[in-house]
Amino acid sequence: MAVMPPRTLLLLLSGALALTQTWAGSHSMRYFYTSVSRPGRGEPRFIAVGYVDDTQFVRFDSDAASQRMEPRAPWIEQEGPEYWDQETRNMKASAQTDRVDLGTLRGYYNQSEDGSHTIQIMYGCDVGSDGRFLRGYRQDAYDGKDYIALNEDLRSWTAAAMAAQITKRKWEAAHAAEQLRAYLEGRCVEWLRRYLENGKETLQRTDPPKTHMTHHPISDHEATLRCWALGFYPAVITLTWQRDGEDQTQDTELVETRPAGDGTFQKWAAVVVPSGEEQRYTCHVQHEGLPKPLTLRWEPSSQPTIPIVGIIAGLVLLGAVITGAVVAAVMWRRKSSDRKGGSYTQAASSDSAQGSDVSLTACKV
């Protein structure tokens, strides 16, 4: 089944970095599946992507020529052919499950065969800085609305729709939660630890933001101050504006964190200020790559050049990334900070022939 899906490309773009919330000191592995029916044009399109923290590492697209799970990060390419064979089998099995589920759900909702419908799934696990299991997830949605979710106890389900009560009863009878919990607490954690170790130069690094401020006159009476943070990793960052030391949260225009195209991220926050009062406003930047928070104030004598080319390039790449990974869902926001890198010993039981994802064929709606 599915996870809360974006229904338009705009939502997909705005949700590019909207991964599930994690806590301080933790790391996460998430898989996002999306299936979209297309009546009269063959079988549904199935796209899956896997993320470790903010980094996409695998991708599968049923429309691709290869029909294979494909690497999206250098450190995953070292996995052997057994790994890729199993991952591909899991993806194809999940695609077929979703194909059946789309028909089942259409019946639950008494919908005609003419319209296009969407199923999504998000599942995964978090580990702490010591590599131990913290929590697991499984959330599903249908046509952009919550459908069913695994509860925090990993033993029960919450149905968010009347039709989902049917699914809940089916899954309870099939002991689906127990099967999923075994994966989340076991193989999911083992593979996440393995990935963190193999990709530690990328996944456990911290790149502090490069910051500056720009000034944009609106009229003779007002101007926009924009606070920029560029080239940082991980994606979690806080930009806040203050006026005479008081937070201006409600008056701040804040964009979603965006990939820059080089493995780092970008973000800006802006406020409209009365002309002549710019010095009363300060921008405060917090990121784990900084030894202490930064405070920026507009300095008229040293107005920087806005890196428009870099920003546009990042936005163009963002479109390509999300179109290729149609599943980075719009609901979940990474809000953690202070994720400290550690050494994650590879679990001996991480069998490449099993793969790090899970075939969800048992969870038919």
UniProtKB/Swiss-Prot annotation:
Keyword Transmembrane helix applies: yes
Ig-like C1-type domain: residues covered: 209-295
Region spans: Alpha-3: 207-298
Signal peptide region: 1-24
Annotated region described as Connecting peptide, given as residue ranges: 299-308
GO molecular function: peptide antigen binding; signaling receptor binding
Residue(s) carrying Phosphotyrosine: 344
SUPFAM superfamilies named among the record's database cross-references: Immunoglobulin, MHC antigen-recognition domain
Region ranges (Alpha-1): 25-114
This protein's GO CC annotations: early endosome membrane; ER to Golgi transport vesicle membrane; external side of plasma membrane; extracellular space; lumenal side of endoplasmic reticulum membrane; MHC class I protein complex; phagocytic vesicle membrane; recycling endosome membrane
Cysteines engaged in disulfide bonds, as pairs: 125-188, 227-283
Family: Belongs to the MHC class I family.
Protein name, entry field: Patr class I histocompatibility antigen, A-108 alpha chain
